Amino acid sequence: MAKQNKGRKFFAASATAALVASAIVPVASAAQLNDFNKISGYAKEAVQSLVDAGVIQGDANGNFNPLKTISRAEAATIFTNALELEAEGDVNFKDVKADAWYYDAIAATVENGIFEGVSATEFAPNKQLTRSEAAKILVDAFELEGEGDLSEFADASTVKPWAKSYLEIAVANGVIKGSEANGKTNLNPNAPITRQDFAVVFSRTIENVDATPKVDKIEVVDAKTLNVTLSDGTKETVTLEKALEPNKETEVTFKIKDVEYKAKVTYVVTTATAVKSVSATNLKEVVVEFDGTVDKETAEDAANYALKSGKTIKSVSLAADNKTATVTLTDKLNNNKADAISISNVKAGDKEINVKNVEFTAVDNKIPEVTEVKSLGTKAVKVTLSEPVENLSSTNFTLDGKAYFGNVVMGAGNKTVILTPYSSSALSVGDHKLTVSGAKDFAGFVSLNSTHEFKVVEDKEAPTVTEATATLETVTLTFSEDIDMDTVKASNVYWKSGDSKKEASEFERIADNKYKFVFKGSEKTLPTGKVDVYVEDIKDYSDNKIAKDTKVTVTPEIDQTRPEVRKVTALDEKTIKVTFSKTVDGESAIKTGNYTVKDKDDKVVSVDKVTVDSKDSKSVIIDLYSKVSVGENTITIKNVKDATKLNNTMLDYTGKFTRSDKEGPDYEHVINADAKAKKVVLKFDKKMDAASLADYSNYLVKINDTLQTLSEDVATLSVSNDATVVTITFAETIKGDDVVFASGKAISGSGKVNVNELQVMGVKDTSGNVHKKFNGSENKITLSSTSTPLKLAKIDKDYDAKYTAELVDRKTVKVKFSTVINSAAANAFTSESHKIDSIQVNGTSTVTVKFKDEINTNASDLDLKVNLSKLVDIAGNESTNNTPIAIKAGINLLDSVAPVVVGEPVVDKETITFTFSENLTSVSIGEVLSTDFTVTRVSDNKDLAIKDYSVAIANNNQVVITLSDNREVATAYKVTAKNAKLITDDNGDKKNAIADFTKTTATKVEASGTLSLDAAKTNLNNEITKAKDAKATGTEGTAATNQIVGSKDALQVAIDVAELVKNDTAATLQQLTDAKTDLTAAITAYNAAKVEDISSLLVAPDLVLGTTDNGTITGFVAGTGETLKVTSDSAANVEVTDPTGLAVTAKAKGEANILVQVLKGDKVIKTGTVKVTVSE
């Protein structure tokens, strides 16, 4: 077989991997070496390591034969074993038979280029290997390099030429070191190499070429993290792909610097790292198993657990192994239904267990059983059951074959029951039998009859305290035996401040022998450090009283845990209950400003008041001014503190809560169709139960003044519009008489029958709520021959009733009607200003009008009219009113569209100006206004601080951003508005904040300080000239468009200040720049200080009064801080009732012009007139 060299770097890597693996996970020796003591001392370690690694084995007799020479076949076998080589092909040496023991080893080493034949046809497997030949195969196989000096060896001259370079390299690498004889060091290059010497040089070679350090130590940090230390001192943190199972030896594979290692590690867990499992085998308990031990106090704190279903947690107990917590509920779980539990703040060593929504399914399929009956002395017996049961009574028990008579007290968690017989001799010392029957668990399963023997032993030992823990607000005591709960009082436990007793305020039974005592109020909370707690007058069930002056010393743990929101519940439409994880501080908990409630439309529902629940100090009750939505609502809570001494403050919380539908439906519209149609259409404000709407027994009708149940021969019922509408269509005749809608009885023999009243009874919505009018007189609908007219209706409950339409986007207007619209003609809506794209009728009382082009954001350019006669309502009514009704901005159109930026920003020196689509206003000024924007300097991509720019509204519809940052170079700026709140449109009742935008200036703003002093003075002087011109051209007065009186004086003050700076020879560049900025702002303010003409704001035509009438001028509303001044130019005809109001009184026929002025302080800022005509 020809020599094949597959690349010798493989060998070094293989050797490293093989021997490193053997160092970590040693294998058993293949054979016991009986002659190990015959191995020379220098070779024992090398031989032992190769034997341990399974590389070298003893012979059939268990001997290594260390001094025997090694053959080429044996050397090939060592290579193959050490490097775990395998041959892919065959060898064709005539002296290597396929059945020879060395065939595979020779095939593998030849194929991998370690050995070659002595000729093309022979390998010479039994030929002894010389020391020179050993050097050659080791140097070639592992690509050793180096230059050694052989002159130090006495027999260097005997080295054959072909072997010289190999031996030099072997010596340089410390593989071959020579041997001492007669004071000389010899190589013995041509001597056969012994088995022990080959083991030594092979091991030396492996150690030499093994540049990869070995694993020295592995520390398991957690389930997925190892800290690995290598033999060269390298330390690496390794993250495993798969988490280790606690307390189980696991083989892991990992890489460090591209070298793969294997090791066996054990993740030893004593304290918990996670929740291992959650289960519920009954409906009152949830069992949480941790993967290690947890802190008893935090694990037994019910506040640290919450169920997704909202079920209330009563208590938590931790098993003796400190790994299993049993959560007992006040409510019961739903059998065979999934739920989830969240756990927080449970301590485990230096960590905390915090998990969200670990799912489990409650499965209770077993009957309850009695697990123990135990005597509590001669006066009581305790029964323990396998699971919580419903309250038991004396009928569930038989004592010694007789009916039981006595007290029955359920223990903590309803898993135990204490029986105290009335007869003092019933539990005499000795053996007794108790039969228990009919114990029902919370899934409804009932226990079988079972009889239990127990022994009564007289109890004369008083209870003692075996364990006591404390926080600054609580003391938890565990007693040596079950305590008679009738003897436990809050005042039994106290601590002393001097001679003053600080008694507990309340207590909670955690277990039959464990109670928590709560100390409320700053005057009762325990001090820090060690404190003595006294326990008095507590008894066991044998009337043994705890020793007088019993005291325990506790060191209260300071509670630094923040309160958390555990549950939010809508108690009704205007009341919310919030439950926290711990008792809350009353002062912070009742502040209404700490709570923000929003309905499903994201509108704020104002909070009226907040009180701490009198029954639960962990809960607050929130009363609202108005209703929350049926379905999902949002609540945000902040700044609430707990009642601990530290007053820990909660983190801000925002969450959803659901209000179930408990409100009865109401009529949205009642339509009485004309006499010909004989229809009544009822439109409800929510989806109804269709079956109840179609049930004739839910309606009464008065026919000829006689009330009777509606029937099919009187009318038909038709349910439509997704069960929100029912149409009652009356028959044309009843028993041959024509049906008419009229009051009273029809004249006998007239051939008519009067139908005059309909009563709607028990119709229900889909949640089963009966409609609101069911129990009152309002369920009566009077029927008449007059049909209900179609009208426009209020579009939004939160705004004035005048608004009957809404601009919802720049191509859409919605119009609200008094009833459901069935159809609209193509010309029902017309517009001369914008082309209508479509009219959408969707089976509701709202019609949507779509336009082809965009409307101004304030709808100032919209001219829309609706013709009611072109619409047909759900009752089939067609209006007779064919006069188109105008829908106009500021009149009856509600603007819900945000102002938008028009065009690109304009840069002028240090200002950036944005023009908007309509006039703007704001609720703030200056630095606060800047929070509506993010300004980014493009040159270094830095967001400016608020102090580095200011924002102002200019020329009514512009926003000017003035920069004051330090710009090292000329740069563009990117301005972003997102969720702005402070700058809104100035159009109508609804204030729409400016729309989101991001704009980058095309022009760069010059670098700071690039302006010269002379240029700055010139700029300031130009601005002063501009200010003087503005002042000179303006006219102060009270007429519309006049400058507001006093505005010139204000501008002059700003001019004077600017001139002082300009004339100051020591003025700095910054002072000149600031003065110019201030004067620019003053000019802007002056230009805006004009008396506004408010005549256009009239919403009604000029008043017309009779000579005896009083009237009110509409359309004028004074804003905050504004007053009205109203005068008449003809008081003889019309007198102003109150000069600060809008009421007028007619005096005589004629006309009067009423001047209405709006004052801010004593300055007129708005003015308008209205003509009032007095007729006869």
Curated annotation (Swiss-Prot):
GO CC terms of this entry: extracellular region; S-layer
Keyword field contains Ion transport: no
Keyword annotations from UniProtKB, A to Z: Cell wall, Repeat, S-layer, Secreted, Signal
Signal sequence coordinates: 1-30
Transmembrane spans: none
Lineage: Bacteria, Bacillati, Bacillota, Bacilli, Bacillales
Matches recorded under InterPro entries: Cell_Envelope_Struct_Comp, Cu-Rt/internalin_Ig-like, SLH_dom
Organism for this UniProt entry: Lysinibacillus sphaericus (Bacillus sphaericus)
Location (main, coarse): secreted
Stretches assigned to coiled coil: none
Function: The S-layer is a paracrystalline mono-layered assembly of proteins which coat the surface of bacteria.
Subcellular location: Secreted, Cell wall, S-layer
Gene3D superfamilies membership: 2.60.40.1220, AF1782-like (1.20.1270.90)
Protein name listed in UniProt: Surface-layer 125 kDa protein
All residue ranges annotated as the SLH domain in the record: 31-88, 89-152, 153-216
Superkingdom of origin organism: Bacteria
